[in-house]
A protein has these predicted regions:
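Conserved class I S-adenosyl-L-methionine
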Residues: 1-38, 51-55, 73-76, 80, 134-164, ...
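Conserved Class I S-adenosyl-L-methionine
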Residues: 49, 183-248
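Short catalytic micro-motifs in class I SAM-dependent methyltransferases
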Residues: 110-111
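A short glycine-rich, Lys/Arg-flanked "PGG" loop and its adjoining helix->strand segment in the class I
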Residues: 119-131
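Short alpha-helix
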Residues: 163-178
Length: 248
């Protein structure tokens, strides 16, 4: 998806911010895979607005290079940067603008389905990583679609997700073909909103690229259904499953 052809960057953080608790959860998950390995330089590939970049710098006391093809996303990331250990560069997964053997961790969040050429992107990750270092991937996969909290309210999103998202096995095949081994894979469940009413407000921000692809009629119908559910007592927290891959 070409984010620069949309206005998603302007509301991305509003729709995607799940709070410090979820950010801490993901830093703990990443740390559990890196363990005692010394991490001095991190590539945040597909960094978007930099949601994870400064948290990575703080957790590992490391330099973080955020790379993203979207000018609008990078403008937002640079505008909110507070940590001098973090910098942002334009680039794509298929041609990472970094030297060989230059990073100790590649962090990727929900980017796999955006790669034009996933096999080339995986080879690029292998190229820039130092020997034995971790490529950590958060990803949506087809196997989780039925568990995504908005699918029941936006049924037209299901075929879009089925077309865009890879199968779990395909993600592994792509990285293993690039010379990685799959050290671990798991599913982590994160809270995305404290209630369905709060979840509706997040989705209304228009930050989800799948929902942004729906017709206005289908999107509005889904929002009505979600808000009706919230009004009828959908006060429970909303959760979402995310696939995690540790490639080395």
């Amino acid at each position: 998806m070409d984010y620069d052809a949309t206005d998603i960057a302007a509301t991305y953080d509003l729709g995607r911010d799940h709070g410090p608790g979820v950010l801490d959860l993901w830093m703990d998950v990443v740390s559990s895979h890196v363990k005692e390995r010394r991490v001095k330089t991190i590539l945040d590939l597909g960094c978007g607005t930099g949601r994870f970049s400064e948290a990575l710098a703080a957790r590992f006391d490391a330099e973080v290079i955020g790379v993203d093809p979207s000018k609008k996303m990078l403008e937002r990331a640079r505008g909110k940067r507070r940590d001098r250990r973090v910098r942002y560069e334009p680039g794509r997964g298929e041609s990472i603008p970094l030297p060989d053997d230059s990073v100790d961790l590649v962090f990727m969040s929900m980017i796999f389905h955006h790669f034009d050429d996933p096999k080339l992107a995986a080879r690029e990750c292998r190229r820039v990583l130092r020997g034995g270092a971790v490529a950590f991937l958060r990803a949506g996969t087809r196997e989780r679609i039925s568990s995504y909290p908005y699918v029941d309210f936006f049924p037209e999103s299901r075929p879009v997700l089925e077309e865009r998202l890879p199968a779990h096995a395909f993600v592994r095949e792509v990285f293993e073909a690039a010379g990685f081994r799959t050290a671990a894979s798991d599913v982590v469940t994160q809270e995305v909103a404290p209630s369905h009413a709060a979840y509706a407000e997040k989705l209304a921000a228009g930050a989800d690229s799948v929902l942004a692809s729906l017709s206005r009629r289908d999107f509005d119908a889904g929002m009505r259904a979600l808000r009706e559910h919230a009004a009828l007592g959908g006060g429970e927290a909303v959760f979402e499953p995310i696939d995690v891959f540790d490639f080395r």
